[in-house]
């Protein structure tokens, strides 16, 4: 197992903060301040509620949950959301702004602070999570011990949830499979190569630069070789600056795409000619992270959502979407993982890198100063 329409998820998936504020509702009412809500807002584990049934009761009393930046075709989130609704029909989920970046998730929380429209929970790239721990409430789910230490903040401020490998998807009716990164610099790929977002804000795009770095004989201590590759791609006229969505892939508008393997693989449902390749050599892996808004308007529902996401049921639903759930190793040992789906995942590269917190932070700073000029 590894040591998160397509949204432009912000930076790092274990691999900056920026983005416009999002006014989700201009006339929203302030969130209610009941004693029970206050108790839920300070709960750091299931023990603070008593039992799961007690947490369920508290969440159902709130009756609502605000999620943000969860496209239904991203890692099978549609089925995850529907499963939660089926299990808890008295909790109405509001799916806010599914295509925004993680940086914009944080801006939405700040813009809507104190309102019942504020997001209750986040799904974030590591760099944005690291930069915004003051926005999060610590919480350790019941399955906390199953989660590798390297993939969780020690107090539960943010926790890895699902991950994958950076890949290249392409329309095989128009292009040959790239066998090496530099193949994409050739004339055959003129105006065709897109990344999923802006790497200063979006995790998948950040990872594309990371992959390009290690494929260019660099290391994750310095993303400059990856930035240089995309500068060459731009100068060759091959870089396509179009936001990648399911629709752009299906229509052929974005025919070659750097993205997570589970997202690229999902496009085969809409385009039978769509193929996915993980380049030989060093691979790049990453996870997204869950966090709870410390000012969540529905704090009990936020914590119940976390408990659900780290249950066997939801972890297997992410697996169904082609992502690698963070509890996969523990579930495999316990016999609770869907072995058919688990064994069907693409083979991992022989050598895989995952950026540390320090490397992610340094890369984010470098991209912030160098990226825009490099791809002009």
Residue ranges of model-derived segments:
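Extracytoplasmic ligand-binding site segments that recognize negatively charged/polar headgroups
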Residues: 66-82, 94-110, 116-253
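Sec-dependent bacterial lipoprotein signal peptides
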Residues: 1-25
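A ligand-binding cleft/hinge motif common to bilobed small-molecule-binding domains
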Residues: 127-133, 250, 255-274
């Amino acid at each position: 197992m590894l040591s998160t329409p397509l949204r432009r998820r912000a930076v790092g998936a274990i691999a900056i903060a920026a983005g416009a504020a999002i006014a989700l509702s201009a006339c929203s009412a302030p969130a209610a301040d009941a004693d029970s809500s206050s108790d839920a807002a300070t709960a750091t584990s299931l023990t603070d509620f008593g039992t799961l049934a007690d947490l369920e009761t508290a969440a159902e009393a709130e009756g609502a949950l605000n999620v943000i930046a969860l496209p239904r075709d991203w890692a099978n989130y549609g089925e995850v959301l529907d499963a939660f609704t089926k299990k808890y029909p008295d909790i109405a989920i509001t799916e806010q702004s599914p295509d925004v970046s993680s940086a914009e998730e944080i801006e939405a929380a700040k813009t809507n602070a104190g309102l019942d429209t504020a997001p209750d929970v986040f799904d974030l790239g590591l760099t944005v999570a690291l930069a915004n721990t003051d926005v999060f409430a610590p919480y350790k789910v019941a399955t906390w011990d199953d989660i590798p230490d390297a993939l969780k903040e020690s107090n539960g401020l943010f926790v890895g949830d699902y991950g994958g490998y950076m890949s290249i998807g392409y329309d095989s009716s128009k292009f040959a499979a790239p066998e090496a990164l530099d193949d994409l610099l050739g004339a055959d790929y003129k105006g065709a190569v897109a990344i999923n977002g802006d790497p200063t804000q979006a995790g998948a795009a950040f990872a594309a630069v990371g992959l390009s770095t290690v494929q260019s004989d660099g290391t994750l201590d310095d993303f400059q070789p990856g930035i240089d590759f995309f500068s060459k791609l731009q100068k060759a006229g091959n870089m396509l600056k179009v936001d990648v969505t399911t629709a752009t892939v299906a229509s052929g508008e974005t025919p070659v795409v750097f993205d997570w393997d589970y997202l690229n693989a999902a496009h085969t449902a809409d385009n039978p000619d769509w193929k996915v390749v993980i380049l030989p050599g060093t691979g790049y892996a990453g996870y997204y992270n869950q966090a709870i808004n410390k000012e969540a308007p529905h704090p009990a529902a936020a914590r119940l959502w976390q408990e659900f996401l780290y249950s066997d049921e939801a972890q297997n639903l992410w697996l169904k979407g082609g992502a690698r759930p963070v509890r996969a190793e523990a579930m495999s040992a316990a016999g609770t993982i869907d072995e058919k789906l688990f064994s069907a995942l693409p083979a991992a590269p022989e050598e895989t890198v995952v950026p540390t917190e320090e490397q992610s932070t340094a890369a984010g700073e470098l991209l912030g100063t160098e990226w825009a000029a490099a791809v002009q």
